[in-house]
Amino acid sequence: MKKTFLLAGILAVSVLGMAETSAKAAGQGAAGKEAVITVKKVENDPEAVALNFINAYYFNLLEGIDDSNWFEAQPLTDNFKKVYRNQERAIKISEQILDGKKISKADQEFARKYSVDYIPIFGATVFYLDEYSVFGMESYDQKTGIVTLKDEKTGIELPVKVVKVKGKWLIEGAGTVNIPN
């Protein structure tokens, strides 16, 4: 339950771009304190950008929240957004194919090119995550820009690629999006 509130807090801060958190959130133990620190340095810290985005994205996914407005407000490169949307479209085309609907050759090829298992970013890995999963920092490789996050509950790791553009850290890749196998 505390983690749900923590994720809700991270989401609210991400959406509003605020650096303040309530005293209650700061008092929720080690995980709460980590979130407070992460949120405060989000614009200057590639690890925090990755951490906040993935945890808020997973929270939205679990809650069934339509994340289109939230998604557009996140620190993402245009290339990330394009590939993400292409993966979403490929999934819809694949669902039509599975339903036996007639699909153009162009759509079939598009689906083959951008297809992912189940959903963008997490792919089929989402089935192995717990409903209370929260990602924490595992490592950051400054040379490659890869931040490796690890789910504290299941141990599942997720790579997130960050790049600095005009002094601001942006996400260029995450999981199935722009991260080579």
For the regions a protein language model found, what residue spans apply to each?
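Positively charged n-region of N-terminal signal peptides that target proteins for export
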Residues: 1-4
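Bacterial N-terminal signal peptides
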Residues: 8-15
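C-terminal segment of classical bacterial N-terminal signal peptides
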Residues: 15-22
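Flexible low-complexity loop/turn motifs enriched in small/helix-breaking residues
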Residues: 22-143, 177-181
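Short, flexible beta-strand-to-coil junctions
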Residues: 57-58, 152-154
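Beta-strand-connecting loop/turn residues
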Residues: 143-145, 167-168
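Short beta-strand segments that buttress and anchor functional surface loops
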Residues: 145-152
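Short beta-strand edge/turn micro-motifs at domain boundaries
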Residues: 155-181
